[in-house]
């Protein structure tokens, strides 16, 4: 059975909202190393370094390259603020 898109991902930049969609997983370039978020991940706040945010929605892998940022994870909602 394929995973369901049950994580609400929102990516903001200082200029605009870049993306808002439901995903089944997302990985980030954390300053302490790359990490992945799946459904029901523990609450977390982390800084991000230059790299690629990779997420899967509807079985399709997509990505966004960033310079720096922060991510907050809580209750299947992932909010990201980045500079591109």
Segments the model singles out, each with a brief description of its role:
Residues 6-84:
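Compact, glycine-rich, soluble single-domain proteins
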Residues 2-3:
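Sequence/structural signature of small/polar-enriched beta-strand/turn repeats
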């Amino acid at each position: 059975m394929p995973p369901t898109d049950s994580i609400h991902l929102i990516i903001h930049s200082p200029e605009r909202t870049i993306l808002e969609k439901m995903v089944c997983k997302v990985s980030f370039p954390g300053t302490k190393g790359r990490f992945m978020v799946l459904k029901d991940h523990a609450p977390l706040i982390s800084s991000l370094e230059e790299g690629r945010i990779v997420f899967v929605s509807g079985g399709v892998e997509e990505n966004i390259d960033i310079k720096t940022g922060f991510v907050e994870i809580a209750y299947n909602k992932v909010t990201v603020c980045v500079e591109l």
